[in-house]
Structures are given as structure tokens and as C-alpha cells.
């Protein structure tokens, strides 16, 4: 039998303190009935003697301290799961938002998931083709990896996220591929963009969307990625799917954490964020991966906007410690009209070596990748030198590198948001650009690959 309390002592922001409680547990789901009969929900955030601090999901407006009834439900926040969720749009708490029927769950699960035994993890080693050359060719995404996108305000990360969700696939595999898309604190226009893009291209049939809008309660943002990841775990480990989880915008998630932390009067950490921000982010990012003996996998692409384009800000800084690399969007490239504006030099995929090569992409992938990186870096240096000393001061080799850098940005990195390049097309495009440089400069590529791909039409 559920106990009902009418002992609300205090309400501060999204938090409510109830006293005189017994047998209440941490993270327990709470039902709050207002004097008007309206039902709201929350979860137990902290317990001290006979007091329980409750985090409210739908906000605290209109709560009367004397008349409000509180019921502790004896279970954590759960989400109903089913394969029928594919092709549907839900709000940030997992309720249908597309006008369709409620999901009849095959099972219900705690949104916090269960810790994965490190020994049970399988090492990521299979290539995922996103259709984006700057990622596939130079910062390869591997099945089971977590690879964030570091963006800035006003940069087209939403378009890139939609493009990856639309185009991503595992090559040479008959396994089903699904996308779980979690949006936190986005505007109505952004939400419409994602829904219309997925619907128009037909990719919504393999996608589950969770939408927490900017005018939804900030506290709901803390639950949204956990609900999305619980759904991904169900599809991956119970249904054997390869699941790509895209979470945007993690900055809004961290802001919601900061809001709750401030309401709890906790001692702030760097820039006002709670001291446990690193630990909290890890509970999301570490839910990516593969499990031995299970055919499915979870690959994560969290997207965050860096305040003031600052890579040292706590959110990108701590994210970089947990994840396996980063894809960085450049405002300079964006101003040049390079789309997507991926800055390949500071970007990194720490697991790229595991997902490329013979039988995965192509034998020449690693060598051409290293040569493209080296050529682009030297080309940028040559262009900087030309700005200071003038083009006449450049040697013929430097001019070739400067020409290569321009062509690399315009033809390789820039492809628009509707072009889906296969890995073969990406690698052949790399060889085409390398022909701009003298053969003597291609020191990072083995001779047999130069003979096979540079001197023949196979590399075109």
C-alpha cells in the first residue's frame, strides 16, 4: 500500500522538500497531486533522516505547501520498451508526441541502466560509414565507439547530425541498423527540422526520436538522454541491432545539472557546474560499446556547443576525457562556405586504426589518411607564410602544398549535407587530390600503393 504525505515543507525552483517520510529510497519515483487534482512526477534526489528532497519533472508552479499530496511509488523512473518505438517521436520523458497510439511495452526498465562488467565488453573494431569524407576518411567512426562533435553557437551541427543519422550504416553486415536521437533543450524550429528531415528521407522508419524542447522543464533534460540510452540498450542487446545514439545538445544537459545543483545549494565547481559533472557525464557516455556474445552494439555521437568556442570550457574538456576523440567544427571554415565545416587537424578518432584497412575499408586507407593530414597541415603553414611574406616568397613545393590545402577544403571536406559518399569514393578522392603534390613528397605512402592507386586510373 502506498503511503500519502501532506507534509511539504519547502519548494525551491525544481526541488521540493517533504518531511516525516519513512522507508523512502534514493532515486524513487514520486507522484505529486496538486490541490487542483493535477498529477505531476518527480524523483527522490536526497534522503536525510525523515526528510526527502524531490526533483520535480514538470516544475513547481502552483504547488500549495498545505494541500499538495505526495506519494512515493517504491520504484525508480522506468520506460516502457518495444521494437514498435522505431519510427515514432516521443517527448523528453518518453511519452508519444506524434499523435500516434501509446506504446504497448514488451518490458519496462530503469532508465539509469545497469553497470556493464568491463570484462564483458568487446573491443570496437568495425567500420561505420557515415557518408561524410572528413569523418570516414580521416577520423573514422568505429562500431561501439563514443565520438563527440564539438560545435559552436550558430554552426550547422544540427544539419550534420541529421546527415549522419540519415546516412550511417555498417558495411558488409546484414544486421539491422537503428538510430536513437535524443534532443535536449532545442528550439521548436530545430525539432521541426529533424522530424521533417527524417520523414522526408524515409530514415524515420529506423529512428526513435526523443524531443525535449527549450520551453520544456529543464529538469526533464536530465532524464531524456537516459531514456534514450535505455531504449538503445534494449534494441542493441535484446533485438540484435547496431544502434547509433545521437545526443544534442549536451551543453543544455549540463546547464540543467547546474540549475538543480544551484537549487540544492551545493558548492559549485568550475564555472558554477557541480563538482560531479565528470562522473555524471560518464554515466551517459560509458553506456556505449559492445558486449561479448551479443550481436548488437551502441555507438554514440554526443553533440555539444562550446560556449564562446572555448575548448577548455568544462563541458567539452570533461567530455574529451571520457570519449574516444572529438570532431571539431570550425567557424573559420564555415565563413568560407565549407560544409560541413569539420576542422580535421584538431579532430581525432582514437579508435580509427581499429576500423580501417584490408577487409574493413581498403588496404591503402591508413597510408593515404596520414599523407592527407601531413599535406593539409603543411599547406596551411604555406598559406600562413604567404599572408606574411607574399606568395612570391614561396617555393614551388610550398605553392603546391598551398594549392593542395585549398583543393582539400573545397573538394574533400566540403560536400554539403545531402551528399552520401561511399568509402571507395572518399579514398579515390584522396588519391585524386594527392596528385597535386610531387610524387617525391608522398613519403608516408608505401611504394606498392603508389604504383597501384596513384599511377593508374584506380585512384580516380
UniProtKB/Swiss-Prot annotation:
InterPro entries registered for this protein in UniProt: ATP-synt_VA_C, ATPase_a/bsu_AS, ATPase_F1/V1/A1_a/bsu_N, ATPase_F1/V1/A1_a/bsu_nucl-bd, P-loop_NTPase, V-ATPase_su_B/beta
CDD domains xrefs: ATP-synt_V_A-type_beta_C, ATP-synt_V_A-type_beta_N, V_A-ATPase_B
Entry GO MF terms: ATP binding; proton-transporting ATP synthase activity, rotational mechanism
Organism: Clostridium novyi (strain NT)
Disulfide bond residue pairs: none
Protein name: V-type ATP synthase beta chain
Keyword Transport: yes
Gene3D superfamilies linked to this entry: 3.40.50.12240
One of the Pfam families matching this protein, by short name: ATP-synt_ab_N
Functional summary from the UniProt entry: Produces ATP from ADP in the presence of a proton gradient across the membrane. The V-type beta chain is a regulatory subunit.
Amino acid at each position: 500500500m502506498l503511503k500519502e504525505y501532506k507534509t511539504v515543507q519547502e519548494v525551491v525552483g525544481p526541488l521540493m522538500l517533504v518531511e516525516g517520510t519513512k522507508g523512502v529510497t534514493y532515486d524513487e519515483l514520486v507522484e505529486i497531486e496538486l490541490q487542483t487534482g493535477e498529477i505531476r512526477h518527480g524523483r527522490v534526489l536526497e534522503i536525510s533522516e525523515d526528510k526527502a528532497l524531490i526533483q520535480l519533472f514538470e516544475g513547481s508552479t502552483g504547488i500549495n505547501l498545505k494541500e499538495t499530496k505526495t506519494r512515493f511509488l517504491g520504484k525508480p523512473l522506468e520506460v516502457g520498451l518495444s521494437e514498435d518505438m522505431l519510427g515514432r517521436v516521443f517527448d523528453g520523458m518518453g511519452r508519444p508526441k506524434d499523435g500516434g497510439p501509446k506504446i504497448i511495452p514488451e518490458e519496462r526498465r530503469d532508465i539509469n541502466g545497469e553497470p556493464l562488467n568491463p570484462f564483458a565488453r568487446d573491443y570496437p573494431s568495425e567500420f561505420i560509414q557515415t557518408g561524410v569524407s572528413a569523418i570516414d576518411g580521416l577520423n573514422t567512426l568505429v562500431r561501439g565507439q563514443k565520438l563527440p562533435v564539438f560545435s559552436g553557437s550558430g554552426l550547422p551541427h544540427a544539419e550534420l547530425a541529421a546527415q549522419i543519422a540519415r546516412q550511417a550504416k555498417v558495411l558488409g553486415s546484414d544486421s539491422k541498423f537503428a538510430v536513437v536521437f535524443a534532443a535536449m533543450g532545442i528550439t521548436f524550429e530545430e525539432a521541426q527540422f529533424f522530424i521533417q528531415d527524417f520523414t522526408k528521407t524515409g530514415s524515420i522508419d529506423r529512428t526513435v526520436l526523443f524531443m525535449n524542447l527549450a520551453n520544456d522543464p529543464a529538469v526533464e533534460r536530465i532524464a531524456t538522454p537516459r531514456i534514450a540510452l535505455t531504449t538503445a540498450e534494449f534494441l542493441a542487446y535484446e533485438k540484435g541491432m547496431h544502434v547509433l545514439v545521437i545526443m544534442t545538445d549536451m551543453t543544455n544537459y549540463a546547464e540543467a545539472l547546474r540549475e538543480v545543483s544551484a537549487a540544492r545549494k551545493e558548492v559549485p565547481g568550475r564555472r558554477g557546474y557541480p563538482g560531479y559533472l565528470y562522473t555524471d557525464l560518464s554515466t551517459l557516455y560509458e553506456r556505449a560499446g559492445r558486449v561479448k556474445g551479443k550481436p548488437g552494439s551502441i555507438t554514440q555521437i554526443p553533440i555539444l556547443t562550446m560556449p564562446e568556442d572555448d575548448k577548455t570550457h568544462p563541458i567539452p574538456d570533461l567530455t574529451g576525457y571520457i570519449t574516444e576523440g572529438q570532431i571539431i567544427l570550425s567557424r573559420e571554415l564555415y565563413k568560407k562556405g565549407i560544409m560541413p565545416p569539420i576542422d580535421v587537424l584538431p579532430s581525432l578518432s582514437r579508435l580509427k586504426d581499429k576500423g580501417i584497412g584490408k577487409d574493413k575499408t581498403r588496404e591503402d586507407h591508413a597510408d593515404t589518411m596520414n599523407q592527407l593530414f601531413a599535406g593539409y597541415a603543411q599547406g596551411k603553414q604555406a598559406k600562413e607564410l604567404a599572408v606574411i611574406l607574399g606568395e612570391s616568397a614561396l617555393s614551388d613545393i610550398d605553392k603546391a602544398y598551398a594549392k593542395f590545402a585549398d583543393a582539400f577544403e573545397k573538394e574533400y571536406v566540403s560536400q554539403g549535407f545531402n551528399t552520401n559518399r561511399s568509402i571507395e569514393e572518399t579514398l579515390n578522392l584522396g588519391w585524386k587530390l594527392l596528385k597535386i603534390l610531387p610524387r617525391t613528397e608522398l613519403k608516408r605512402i608505401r611504394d606498392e600503393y603508389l604504383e597501384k592507386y596513384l599511377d593508374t586510373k584506380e585512384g580516380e
